[in-house]
A protein has these predicted regions:
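Metal-dependent amide/peptide-bond hydrolase catalytic core
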Residues: 1-3, 27, 50, 54-57, ...
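Acidic/His- and Gly-rich active-site-bordering loop/insert found
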Residues: 2-107, 128, 132
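Short glycine-aspartate micro-motif
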Residues: 76-78, 104, 163-167, 188, ...
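A structural signal for isolated positions on well-ordered beta-strands in alpha/beta enzyme cores
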Residues: 78, 135-139, 285
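Short beta-strand segments
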Residues: 80-81, 139-141, 166-169, 190-192, ...
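Glycine/serine-rich anion-binding loops at beta->alpha junctions
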Residues: 87, 102-118, 197
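Acidic/histidine-rich catalytic neighborhood of metal-dependent amide-processing enzymes
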Residues: 112-182, 381-382
Length: 382
């Protein structure tokens, strides 16, 4: 057992202490002060260990934080983690971190404050073996839960030239890691029509609701389960009163797909549907609100084998799992970079008031993460 793995074996209590601090700090995606406060805890933990953190200011959202262990000339390894959660400000004071000794509970405990802890302790452990044959970077972002609008370009920039990306989103309930994810796009459709009294001069109106309803039927027809494509309009609103022909209507569309190459054709079909004027006197506008690219597993088969081997050496087994959920790992995987996700501690019921994390997975998952990085180092030297 090398020094880094052995050191991690003694870090259960410090890891839980940091986890408690993070969970007890509100960090909704739109709460910049809260997301930055979580960042302050991470900065303190790393700087106490002698690791500097670079901050890139972001207006309106959490700043971007980058820490790096210097290394040799081999391509770097990048770790990812997001500091924001879906829970509104005030959740942590109302129901903060608790534990029954086996499980930890609290807002974002699994998604993904447990993963942030792993990233910190992985870097601190690897520092004990420095210098490595390559730099190891950790990027902490602040708006993943709402689409990574401020983070995507930075993620892709920092990932340029890296040999692998390891994202510590929560491990699956099964204990598995994530080897493939769907891509997802959220779109806003805004339809305008012409108001009229529904009894006095109905024919003078142009119903935005009718036009939108016709589009929804066509949009839902884009679903193709055999190809892994789904279309879902989950929100609709419109009109001013029941006796007025609706002058406006809006809908939010969620699209999921499994291959990067699918998106261009899907988008073209959506644009054609939105632009079609089914009801004379109406028009529609389409806006992309959030875009996550899919994480295709074919890029990461070797990386998954390395992680599985490290897990077995530590006494637990994992497989790669596919999920329909999206994550920042899709951005790097779509660039062809070997990427694994779901490497964080095992947890479940995320985004609910019953979210939990299995405390006894903190150390072994951190060890497997570090072991994977060290195995990449050995492979590069062979």
């Amino acid at each position: 057992m090398n020094d880094a793995i052995a050191w991690l074996a003694k870090q259960q209590e410090p890891m839980q202490d940091l986890l408690r601090s993070l969970v007890d700090t509100d960090s909704n995606s739109y709460d910049k002060a809260g997301v930055d406060a979580v960042g302050a805890h991470l900065i303190a933990a790393l700087e106490q260990g002698g690791i500097e953190v670079q901050r890139t200011a972001v207006e309106g959202f959490g700043d971007l934080l980058l820490a790096e262990l210097p290394g040799g000339s081999q391509p770097p390894v990048l770790l990812l983690g997001h500091r924001d959660t879906v829970f509104p400000k005030g959740t942590a004071p109302a129901r903060g971190y608790t534990t029954d000794g086996t499980l930890a509970f609290g807002p974002g405990v699994a998604d993904m404050k447990g993963g942030l802890v792993l990233n910190c302790f992985a870097l601190l452990a690897l520092q004990r073996l420095a210098p490595l044959p390559f730099p190891v970077r950790v990027l902490f972002t602040g708006d993943e839960e709402i689409g990574s609008g401020t983070a995507r370009d930075h993620i892709e920039q920092v990932a340029q030239g890296v040999q692998a990306v390891l994202n510590t989103e929560p491990g699956r309930v099964s204990g598995n890691v994530v080897s493939a994810r769907k891509g997802g796009v959220r779109l806003l459709i805004e339809v305008t029509g012409r108001a009229a009294h529904s009894g006095v001069n109905h024919a003078d109106g142009a119903s935005a609701i009718e036009a939108l309803a016709r589009k929804v039927v066509k949009l839902h027809a884009l679903t193709d389960y055999g190809r892994g494509i789904t279309a879902n309009v989950g929100l609709m609103s419109g009109g001013t009163s029941s006796n007025t022909v609706a002058p406006a209507a809006t809908a939010e569309l969620d699209i999921r797909f499994v291959e990067v190459a699918q998106w261009a054709a899907i988008k073209a079909a959506i644009v054609a549907i939105v632009e079609e004027q089914e009801v004379p006197g109406t028009q529609a506008v389409l806006t992309e609100c959030a875009v996550f690219m899919p994480m295709e597993g074919r890029h990461s088969l070797d990386l998954l084998d390395i992680y599985r081997g490290q897990a077995l050496e530590l006494g637990f087994s994992v497989e790669g799992e596919f999920t329909g959920g999206c994550a920042d790992s899709g951005f790097t995987a779509s660039l062809g970079i070997p990427t694994l996700c779901g490497l964080g501690p095992v947890g479940g019921k995320v985004h609910t008031d019953r979210e939990y994390l299995e405390l006894d997975t903190l150390v072994p998952r951190a060890q497997a993460l570090v072991g994977t990085i060290l195995q990449l180092a050995k492979r590069g030297q062979s």
